[in-house]
Amino acid sequence: MPVLAIVGDGGFQYGIAELATARQHALDVTLVVIDDGGYGILREYQGEAGFAHTGVDLVHLDFAALFDAYEIPVRRSERGRLRDELAWALEQRGPSAVVLEDVLRMPVPSALADL
């Protein structure tokens, strides 16, 4: 059964080693990595609460090059092209990926805004 995983770049870095498993076993998984340069949700929480952004910005990693290193088909995308790039990725056999370079916002304020 095909799997679609949508993950931020910060969280994705906790499980990079699993790319080897996906590649070795030709797992039918498509990854969409939202590359916003750090722990975006934590950055949002800190900003909403009026705190300075601390410990949430990461060194930029070329995620497309990482997927290439594992010989996993990958496309870079941006918001206006995501639908087409995702359709391409879902057509691939075995693992595939789309790297979306964008900053997404939380749809609703967190409870931290009330602090």
Stretches with model-predicted labels:
Residues 1-115:
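Thiamine diphosphate
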